[in-house]
Amino acid sequence: MLKTEKILHLKTQRGRSVRAVREHYLREDVRCGSALCHTCPRDGKLLSEELTHYVVPDCQVLQDYQEVLEFPELRGIIIMQTACQAVQHQRGRRQYKKLCSLLRDTRHDCILFSNEFQNHAYLPREMGESALAWQTRCIYNSCVWYYQHCQKKIPVVMVTEDESVIGKYNTETQEVYVVSFQIYLETFWPNFKGALELYKSLRDTHLERKLESRESNGKEYPEHLPLEILEAGIKSGRYKQGVLSVNKHRAQLESFVRLQGLGGKETDIQSDIFIHGTKPRNRAIHGDLVAVELLPKSEWKGRTGALCENETDEKVGDMQAEVMPTGRVVGIMQRNWRDYVVTFPAKEDTETQGKNTQKVLVMPWDYRIPKIRISTQQAEALQNYRVVVRIDSWESNSLYPNGHFVRALGRAGNLEAEIATILVENSISLNPFSEAQLAEMPSNTHENPWQVKPEEGDRLDLRETHLVFSIDPKGCEDVDDALSIRVLPSGDLELGVHIADVTHFVQHNTYTDIEARSRATTYYLADRRNDMLPLILSADLCSLLGAVDRYAVSVIWEMDCSTYEIRRVWYGRTIIRSSYKLSYEVAQQLLDGDLEPLSTEKELHPLKQDPARLQQLLWAVGKMTEVAHATRMRRNMSGALELEGVEVRVQLGEKHSIDDLVPKQPLQVHETIAECMILANHWVAKKIWESYPQHALLRLHPPPRQEFFQELKECAKARGFSIDTRSNKALADSLDQAHDPSDPLVNQLLRMMATQAMSNARYFSTGSYTEDEFYHYGLALEKYTHFTSPIRRYADIVVHRLLLAAVNKGPKDHLLGNKDLEELCRHINARNRAAQQCQKQSTELFQCMFFKDKDPDSDQRCISDAVIYGIRTNGVLLFIPRYGIKGAAYLKNTDGLVLACEEDGQCRWVHGSLQRLPAQIVVTTQEAKSFSFCLFDHVTVRIRIQSSRFHPDSIRLEIISNRPNPSQEALPSASNPQLLRTELVKEVTRTAVEAQLAVEGAAELKPVERYQEYRQTQGQSLYTMLEELWDLALLDVSGA
């Protein structure tokens, strides 16, 4: 090993140049990472032997065109340490982290070569030599060494944007080529148009940025403060740090900074900080981590209480326009830029945006994102397309951020393009499982059937001793869990929850494990799903299907036969053979004593001739329901919440047209299964925390902020109820008492509003929190985790590994420490939020599709009963039970007319005024006639669709009568208060809609079979979204 010195010229965060001297060690045994080399260690990522060449980007190409190199189709990429360090020092933490992630990702065929530690690859910097010239010379010398090290078996191509470098080095060494990046893409990847298009888009953006910096010095915004000044200000309490959240309904006017912790000094700021207008936002974009300076109290403002475009119930606490802490953004702590879907303006608008028609202001799909300026030659060709762009910069002299074109998704209005838009907007990128991942999968064919292995003999075998069965949605193929219950010789009960043993098939750090970790969850849309695991696992070998042997991880309790108090618990690996695969409907019929399924369900036909076996099954379902009820009552006594969510499924006709939107109906057996899953999750949480108190993965649900309950309290007060929100127990008791015998929907709406006020539940590592912070507010449990759905949640896979290590049935050397586990939890939480938002937006898409082809003036399906649940200064918020839709209706239109009601209840627009009161809004006409719209009033509405060229279509509601719709049938959940409690349990309902809208917007349907091939569940699936209450991921009501 040779010791030398390396002189670095660095810049501080304030821009000051610093000369630093570092010790530098050179070695002979630096790993090359090529599969062609048989002398270096072969651990870690290796470049394939099958490649035709290796490609090495120089520093400038890596910095400016890293996005192009991220395409997995580009293979054989060698990132030199010299170029990697240039990114770190010159492009900042964000791009460097992306580069490190790319190098770690086994799905991308790229490696890091530590050329500056290799004795013969490294060249010291010469006196007077510029940093860029030295970096280029060092990288080229490393390319030559690498080519010779691989015994000249494969050519090496160095790509650069510097023509002088090409002229100097291109002919210097045979089989080591130096070419421009564009020539490389055109020559070596002629059929990969996407990479070349992205390269040209980035190139044009860099040229435009250089021109703009020369042309204009005028400031549109103040400069951001340097990072070290911001950090000092946050520490002293002068500045506050938080995430910028833009109100999508008033994106130009209202945004809020949600504080991530108070400063070092005492402060009375305990709420969000209001940012009024775009100038004080100072180029911050929704999701950025920002530093904010509070304005003087005399300049504080309040958010408006009026309806505006796109008003829905996405927020809480908008009852009054009270003054709140107001500030301005002084700096960006961390950008949160992502891919954005945009649409080009109409042709006539494009031509008026400047002399250079290649520079276009495109409109983002997301209302919260400002217009983005891009340079492209495809503006006219992509007029009616949804396209993806990325933001590159936002200089202080520009009104809008600068970005570049990435790719087109398809025509706006086309179903597949709209679905792709939703995925991109939620940063979800799902490629088919790779050959490497599928190669890890076991086989289960007719010729080579899968069987229980002899080496698994230490598992507890339940196949002959236990009646095991599952209860799932009809047609479900991905069965995560099965149950058993029996009476022990001692007279006690034994209850078992058996969960698919996914970790047996998905070993740590395999290709499948890495892909599952990246996806973190299965993504559900209204008409399809994208799985976390390959189909052979999720729908076959990990699925606890009936009459086949399967591996499971089980939790088995021994409990008192009368009180159901738990005496002992056992955890471990098992082998099971499920006897019955029941649907929820069939299980509910059996629970109710209805034996019709014995004739209608083929699986149950043998029970007609076996009354003893039938009684055993009936007893098991009934006893399990009793145990679940007792367990639930104990949680209720501790303060468990019974809240409401809205779940709607798309009902298809024979030709796959959308025939109806149907709210999901709850069953008692839903709650039974959910409670058993909660019990298993709770006990597993206790076990893994006891074994690994510093790095167990648990799930917490923090108490909600009290100000979010304000609208709930006001609404309850309007009906004479008082809501106590001091604790979860007080809230639960208050909601139980808030029943209106004349209208059960009142209690349902109050519970839905309580749900809106809740905080988000999230995963965490126990070493990062104190024990009193572990509490799950919604479920009233001291410790909770997710164990029961490893097929569709990566968190459950981690918990399985922890549990098996804790009971000495699994390896311990791969368990994550607290820091790594906390980082993984942040990733999973982010992916879960994306999955929830994606599912919500896709359902809204199909709701709009359902109404879009209907005439709202003549089609009775567009006329519905609605309930007022919110009052605004110019309108009301409505809930439509028939379709599970929330929306807003104006009482004052753009012409200044107000909505007045005739004696027969019909409404019309007249001159007049509005007066907003806490529980009602009063309409007064010029003739001095007054009408009131009160909270919880039933009205009749007309449903229309508002189409948008740039944004998603949205539902618009018009009040046509201040009386209930006489033809509307009441929902069962509204007419039967006893069913309200089981609405806590939610299941995603999905269909196999195969629709593609034609170019001009007409529906063109495709066969469903193509997607059914990849689906796991035919029909409804419970455990996908049980902890989600529409937007908030609150309720972990099953262990799913």
From Swiss-Prot:
<dbReference type="Pfam" id="PF00773">
    <property type="entry name" value="RNB"/>
</dbReference>
<feature type="domain" description="CSD2">
    <location>
        <begin position="360"/>
        <end position="426"/>
    </location>
</feature>
<dbReference type="GO" id="GO:0006402">
    <property type="term" value="P:mRNA catabolic process"/>
</dbReference>
<keyword id="KW-0271">Exosome</keyword>
<comment type="function">
    <text>Catalytic component of the RNA exosome complex which has 3'-&gt;5' exoribonuclease activity and participates in a multitude of cellular RNA processing and degradation events.</text>
</comment>
<dbReference type="GO" id="GO:0000177">
    <property type="term" value="C:cytoplasmic exosome (RNase complex)"/>
</dbReference>
<dbReference type="InterPro" id="IPR012340">
    <property type="entry name" value="NA-bd_OB-fold"/>
</dbReference>
<keyword id="KW-0378">Hydrolase</keyword>
<keyword id="KW-0694">RNA-binding</keyword>
<keyword id="KW-0963">Cytoplasm</keyword>
<dbReference type="GO" id="GO:0008859">
    <property type="term" value="F:exoribonuclease II activity"/>
</dbReference>
<dbReference type="Pfam" id="PF17216">
    <property type="entry name" value="Rrp44_CSD1"/>
</dbReference>
<dbReference type="Pfam" id="PF17849">
    <property type="entry name" value="OB_Dis3"/>
</dbReference>
<comment type="subunit">
    <text>Component of the RNA exosome complex.</text>
</comment>
<dbReference type="InterPro" id="IPR041505">
    <property type="entry name" value="Dis3_CSD2"/>
</dbReference>
<dbReference type="InterPro" id="IPR001900">
    <property type="entry name" value="RNase_II/R"/>
</dbReference>
<dbReference type="InterPro" id="IPR033771">
    <property type="entry name" value="Rrp44_CSD1"/>
</dbReference>
<keyword id="KW-0269">Exonuclease</keyword>
<keyword id="KW-0460">Magnesium</keyword>
<keyword id="KW-0540">Nuclease</keyword>
<feature type="domain" description="CSD1">
    <location>
        <begin position="232"/>
        <end position="310"/>
    </location>
</feature>
<protein>
    <recommendedName>
        <fullName>DIS3-like exonuclease 1</fullName>
        <ecNumber>3.1.13.1</ecNumber>
    </recommendedName>
</protein>
<dbReference type="GO" id="GO:0000175">
    <property type="term" value="F:3'-5'-RNA exonuclease activity"/>
</dbReference>
<dbReference type="GO" id="GO:0003723">
    <property type="term" value="F:RNA binding"/>
</dbReference>
<dbReference type="InterPro" id="IPR050180">
    <property type="entry name" value="RNR_Ribonuclease"/>
</dbReference>
<dbReference type="InterPro" id="IPR022966">
    <property type="entry name" value="RNase_II/R_CS"/>
</dbReference>
<comment type="similarity">
    <text>Belongs to the RNR ribonuclease family.</text>
</comment>
<feature type="domain" description="RNB">
    <location>
        <begin position="459"/>
        <end position="808"/>
    </location>
</feature>
<dbReference type="GO" id="GO:0016075">
    <property type="term" value="P:rRNA catabolic process"/>
</dbReference>
